[in-house]
């Protein structure tokens, strides 16, 4: 099966950036600034090219980023250097985070990064890793597509995105002619089931407008 590294290497940082409308990013950043505090130690998990890491750091937030794609991290580091902002970027996998216990007060995991883990056991590992590196009373905020949005894409006639199911709840798309890595389709019920297996102190799952479009928002507190 195609890996995330292969997809992002082929799509490239610039190609990925073109997939996100500036207005979406602006609204999402505004939301993040409301839920995060500058005194917190924050991890941007699956940070990509630093779409949120860099502007949050510019705004005075204590944040660092982790991603599994070397080419996306290269752009993030170069952009941060150009902006003269010291940000720590690390290559790594969310199923085995290279951090000590209780390293962060908050974790954000944006776009569709979490559901690129197509096996439930890997998703459980990632959630447990988030809890491990969070401080007591810390939280993780995960954003994934709303189920109705994904199923609509399965029927879309858009020329830039074509999606199809490949097994169970896993979908694969072709984006701008590039075969994307598969994604696991979660709805509110399946996400709740996953959380009950991980057993955080508290969690909340909602489907609401985020960045000007319907998204599934997942909160998890240690």
Where would I find each of the regions flagged by the language model?
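Core SAM-dependent methyltransferase catalytic element
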Residues: 209-222
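SAM-dependent methyltransferase
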Residues: 141-196
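A short glycine-rich, Lys/Arg-flanked "PGG" loop and its adjoining helix->strand segment in the class I
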Residues: 124-136
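A short SAM/SAH-binding and catalytic strip from SAM-dependent methyltransferases
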Residues: 106-121
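Class I SAM-dependent methyltransferase SAM/SAH-binding core
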Residues: 51-96
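Conserved class I S-adenosyl-L-methionine
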Residues: 1-37, 39-48, 51
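A short acidic, Gly/Pro-enriched loop at the edge of an enzyme's catalytic core
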Residues: 95-106
């Amino acid at each position: 099966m195609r890996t995330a590294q292969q997809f992002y290497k082929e799509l490239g940082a610039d190609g990925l950036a073109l997939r996100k409308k500036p207005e979406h990013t602006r609204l999402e950043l505004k939301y993040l600034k409301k839920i995060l505090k500058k005194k917190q130690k924050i991890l941007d998990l699956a940070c990509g090219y630093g779409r949120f890491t860099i502007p949050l750091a510019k705004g005075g937030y204590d944040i660092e980023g982790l991603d599994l794609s070397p080419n996306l991290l290269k752009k993030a580091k170069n952009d941060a250097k150009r902006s003269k902002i010291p940000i720590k970027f690390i290559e790594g996998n969310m199923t085995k985070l290279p951090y000590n216990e209780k390293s962060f007060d908050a974790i954000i995991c944006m776009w569709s990064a979490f559901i690129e883990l197509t096996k439930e056991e890997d998703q459980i590992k990632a959630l447990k890793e988030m809890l491990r590196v969070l401080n007591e009373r810390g939280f993780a905020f995960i954003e994934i597509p709303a189920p109705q949005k994904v199923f609509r894409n399965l029927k879309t006639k858009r020329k830039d995105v074509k999606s199809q199911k490949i097994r169970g709840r896993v979908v694969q798309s072709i984006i701008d002619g590039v075969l994307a890595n598969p994604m696991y389709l979660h709805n509110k019920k399946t996400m709740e089931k996953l959380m009950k297996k991980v057993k955080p102190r508290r969690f909340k799952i909602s489907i609401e407008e985020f960045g000007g479009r319907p998204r599934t928002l997942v909160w998890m507190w240690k």
